[in-house]
């Protein structure tokens, strides 16, 4: 029972048998805490439960939570690969009590699991407690039979946990194992506690206080439990190895890397194999949860992780992209526990392959610069932080990659100067994930949710209903009434108004009663499932307890339904045309348009867009029934229902099926398009009317966007396009069918005329005749040196060099200078010197003289041919005279 997968199952099943609900891991991108970059602990998804802002149907829970610590406050990136225990991605096993059992039961459950189920020996174990927590110490004596020397009292914050400056907090107790004298280190609290001999593997947090202010702490009415055990650490203990990288999971990933490289690790490069194995996990899980590499926020952290792994692959001799070729091994090991890996496998591979391909183009160049700039440094020296920033900013080298490359030489990077140069980018990155400061405003909604419960949504079946006002909010505070002319928010016990979510905008409409009219301008979800109607009282006054008639804007809702259903059709059509890697990244479903963002690494061609549009419209024309079914989430996924990456779903979900295959098959739903979706949809695909794609663009690296219209809007757009095409055909004196050929012929004719005009201008520039005899009349003799100098018109800079070469041949011996003025008044000049004179005159020197007159700075080229420019083309004549003066001087 020592394999990672078996350890995970044993832990979860043990707590399930002891009355705990097994709760799926939440995504790595926190849904309820914008101040966190990544989920880094098991309690994150339960934060609002602990604070009392959210209620769950259970009081005990157990999870295996995927976590990342590679950015922000918790950052283990630099240590990964070089220590026995640091990881960027890890699984935290945990059990939680929300006001149910407390210290004694928590300690008893932990002790029985590790000694009975996991078989750990008592004489190898010891624990820490907060120095004043006599209660916990007493329970350890009672339950485990520990003597005082096995219960170490710690007076620091290491054994007192707090959620923040205020809120739930309490002492904690950590469980350690002594791994033997062959490993350096001392017990916790000793001078050598940072060694690896005594390994902490489980932390039991006893939430028993509420930190009201800095100086005031009061007991919580319902104390809670939050525990966290590192799965990888426990695996190393049970498998009898000293490093997490020697456990079965990591050995399989390292073996896959060895197979791909054609060689195994050596003592010198073992760290690189470990880095690749760890970073493969964190990168893959982040991509599966919807994070893509970019230059800011979470995407930047992902890029740092990926590029660090790619750098180590390069150190191991990989000549081609490596990481994407290892994804299958990770899916094999962890796909059963985390099915999102299986669903996202193709997307992970494609994202990694393209990122590594991009990075390899600049890696060699950046490393060459790094080697050049650090060539004079020796062990103990400091590498300039400004240069490190240039490597990041210009070549995409994250700081940690630069540090990693210099680590083996014993050279450090000047972090202070790097940070100074990086401040703006860091601020921008933080802005993409830091909280917006709305927590105080949001508190009113959580308070109301606690008091009122969830709003009953009726909008799947009706657009009209009656409801009773249960709360009124104005300027972020509860009020007893809203008067005519006042804007605010109304909550009713039940509503047909759809609240904005899943990309679908909120409904608008009116709430009315005798002499009362409230115009709803938006409907939003607050505190999870509290439907809030925002708007203005146009007539009368609305008070708590009033009964209102609720009427959704029917025409607007109908248009939204069509656009939402069309989004599903386009999603499936994109997968058919472009591949299974297509995954939704976001959407907007509005009454007048829709847009759909998805993972794809290159622009979509017009032919591909046409195919996508045709496939979607074929389903529309079939006019099949749209089937909606409530299902268990696992059954829905088994039926092939597509889910939004990174989204957290409840135990029961709505499944929307479209297309000929949509039919009843007992507990499963099959269809041409099958998605988990809480939005509103048409009854039949024919109700969409028509789908018209109006645009395609890039949103971010690896993310594309299509925009489309449906129904009347699509028809109007198509009619407008046809009218424009007919008008164009009329102007071209052709038919619609023949217009493409007519346009091609006209474009060919235009190119021909442009070429002829260009040749004519060149001849005119060189004297006006094909023989070029007119040019000879412009030649001056300056001290025995022939100078051909002209200001020409209508000549592009790219043609000037050819004309100068032609002039040099005509002169035989001499200097030729041509100045052309562009439409915006800028001047360009090219100077040529025949081979026999380059020892006396440099074209570069002469062209710089002319450039100064034109208001330019310098110029460049070779002694026989050089060019320059300046903003003032009106001084072309004076520029030529400057060249003449230089020759005569």
Swiss-Prot record:
Location comes to: Cytoplasm
Q: What is its main location?
A: cytoplasm
Q: Which SUPFAM superfamilies match?
A: Class II aaRS and biotin synthetases, Putative anticodon-binding domain of alanyl-tRNA synthetase (AlaRS), ThrRS/AlaRS common domain, Translation proteins
Please give the Pfam families that the UniProt record associates with this protein. Answer: DHHA1, tRNA-synt_2c, tRNA_SAD
Which domain of life does the UniProt lineage start with?
Bacteria
What EC number(s) are associated with this protein in UniProt? 6.1.1.7
- Cofactor binding note from Swiss-Prot or TrEMBL: Binds 1 zinc ion per subunit.
GO annotation, biological process: alanyl-tRNA aminoacylation; negative regulation of DNA-templated transcription
What is the required cofactor set for this protein?
Answer: Zn(2+)
- Could you name the Gene Ontology cellular component terms for this entry? cytosol
Name the HAMAP family on file.
Answer: Ala_tRNA_synth_B
Domain-related comment = Consists of three domains; the N-terminal catalytic domain, the editing domain and the C-terminal C-Ala domain. The editing domain removes incorrectly charged amino acids, while the C-Ala domain, along with tRNA(Ala), serves as a bridge to cooperatively bring together the editing and aminoacylation centers thus stimulating deacylation of misacylated tRNAs.
Name of protein: Alanine--tRNA ligase
> What organism does this protein naturally occur in?
Rhodopseudomonas palustris (strain ATCC BAA-98 / CGA009)
